[in-house]
């Protein structure tokens, strides 16, 4: 943000020299040889009497302090006067003129010496082009720093967006992990139920085995008892009856029948036990495979989560580092910008001062030059008087000119965040 402020000042220049003038000696144009000159103190209030001129008026100035002032009336009256007195008066007046010319020449030499000393003291104008180059380089550095800051801000925004994406992925993976852990809990409960069922079946198998052993033992006892009874019975009865059945054969048949029944029951029990064992073994294998798969998934998810946490932590550290770097860079460039602004303001102030000094020196030089020209004109006029040449009274009267000079001072200030970081003053002289 910048704005300009202008201040105007004006000054009047009389005779091309502001506030300073040197008075010149009175200059006259005698009309004929029969003339008388009467001079007042300082060259003002002079009277010249000429027989053929009716009246002439002119203004003269005296001293080195003010403008041309002290206007006197010159009356030329006709009449015959004594030639000797006239020549005496003219010689006296001419002597005073010569003395005045010598004093003016001395003053002119002193002014030339002062001008030469002032010029040598000031020296040549300072070359500001190296500062312009340095200012351009600093502006380029500020621009490059601004671009670097923009890139850093963009990188920070990208890192923030990437961190947000990783956070979303982490939350999604965490939800999947929780669901998998829930499934694992259900599978563990199912495994526990399966183990309990397996233990119950094993207990049933053991009880069936014990029952089978008990049945075999009872059967063997019954067979032994029947065989003992058959052996103890030794009675032979001979009757006329049909041929009796063979008890041994019957017992063998019964034994074979019971053996077949027991074998069949054993086979049925073994088949049922084998089928149950195979079924539960298959279920256990399936559950074991699912559990292993779930464990692998959980391990992979845990590994992924750890890698994501590590990457998230690294991104957070990188973000903190970039933010610290950005803060330091902003502080450093703000300090450098403030220093550059102060340097630029100082250079602009020096430039304004140099311009003002140049203008003042130019005005002083112009005033001295005008004074020198006036003195040379007066000396030339005195020489013409000494040589006896005639001249118009209008040539002897100095031309008083008034010139108005208007100065326009433009102050430009650059404001950043409410602070003035740069200020420049530009002075322009307008001659009316």
UniProtKB/Swiss-Prot annotation:
Region ranges (Coil 2): 251-388
Coiled-coil regions listed in the entry: none
PTM annotation: Phosphorylated.
Sequence ranges of Low complexity compositional bias: 1-21
Region (Linker 12): 227-250
SMART domains tied to this protein: Filament (SM01391)
Residues flagged as site, Cleavage: 240-241
GO CC annotation terms, alphabetical: cytoskeleton; keratin filament
GO MF term set: structural molecule activity
Cited PROSITE patterns: IF_ROD_1 (PS00226), IF_ROD_2 (PS51842)
Annotated region (Disordered), positions in chain: 1-44
Tree of life domain: Eukaryota
Annotated region (Head), positions in chain: 2-82
Site keyed Stutter: positions: 333
UniProt similarity note: Belongs to the intermediate filament family.
Subunit structure: Heterotetramer of two type I and two type II keratins. Keratin-18 associates with keratin-8.
Function: When phosphorylated, plays a role in filament reorganization.
PANTHER family: INTERMEDIATE FILAMENT (PTHR23239), KERATIN, TYPE I CYTOSKELETAL 18 (PTHR23239:SF349)
Protein's name according to its UniProt entry: Keratin, type I cytoskeletal 18-B
Organism: Xenopus laevis (African clawed frog)
Chain's gene name: krt18-b
């Amino acid at each position: 943000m910048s704005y300009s402020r202008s201040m105007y000042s004006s000054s009047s220049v009389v005779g091309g020299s502001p506030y300073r003038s040197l008075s010149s000696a009175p200059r006259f144009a005698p009309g004929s040889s029969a003339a008388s000159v009467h001079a007042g103190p300082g060259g003002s209030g002079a009277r010249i009497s000429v027989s053929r001129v009716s009246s002439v008026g002119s203004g003269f100035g005296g001293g080195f302090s003010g403008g041309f002032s002290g206007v006197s009336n010159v009356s030329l009256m006709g009449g015959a006067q004594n030639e000797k007195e006239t020549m005496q008066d003219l010689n006296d007046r001419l002597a005073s003129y010569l003395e005045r010319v010598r004093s003016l020449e001395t003053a002119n030499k002193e002014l030339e010496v002062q001008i030469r000393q002032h010029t040598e003291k000031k020296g040549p104008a300072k070359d500001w082009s190296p500062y312009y180059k340095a200012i351009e380089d600093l502006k380029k550095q500020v621009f490059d720093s601004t671009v670097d800051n923009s890139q850093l801000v963009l990188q920070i925004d990208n890192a923030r967006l990437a961190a947000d994406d990783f956070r979303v992925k982490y939350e999604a993976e965490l939800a999947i992990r929780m669901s998998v852990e829930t499934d694992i809990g259900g599978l563990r409960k199912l495994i526990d139920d399966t183990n309990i069922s397996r233990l119950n079946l094993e207990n049933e198998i053991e009880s069936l085995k014990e029952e089978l052993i008990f049945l075999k033992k009872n059967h063997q006892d019954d067979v032994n008892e029947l065989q003992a009874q058959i052996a103890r019975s030794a009675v032979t009865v001979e009757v006329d009856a049909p041929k009796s059945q063979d008890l041994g054969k019957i017992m063998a048949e019964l034994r074979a029948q019971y053996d077949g029944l027991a074998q069949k029951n054993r086979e049925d029990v073994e088949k049922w036990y084998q089928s149950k064992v195979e079924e539960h073994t298959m279920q256990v294998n399936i559950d074991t495979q699912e559990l292993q798969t779930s464990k692998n998934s959980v391990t992979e998810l845990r590994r992924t989560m750890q890698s994501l946490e590590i990457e998230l932590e690294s991104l957070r550290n990188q973000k903190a580092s970039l933010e610290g770097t950005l803060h330091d860079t902003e502080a450093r460039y703000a300090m450098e910008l403030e220093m550059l602004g102060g340097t630029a303001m100082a250079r602009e102030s020096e430039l304004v001062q140099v311009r003002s000094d140049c203008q003042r020196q130019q005005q002083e030089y112009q005033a001295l030059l005008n004074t020198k020209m006036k003195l040379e004109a007066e000396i030339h006029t005195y020489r013409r008087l000494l040589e006896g040449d005639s001249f118009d009274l209008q040539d002897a009267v100095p031309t008083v000119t008034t010139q108005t000079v208007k100065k326009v001072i433009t102050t430009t200030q650059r404001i950043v965040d409410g602070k003035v970081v740069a200020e420049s003053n530009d002075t322009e002289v307008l001659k009316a």
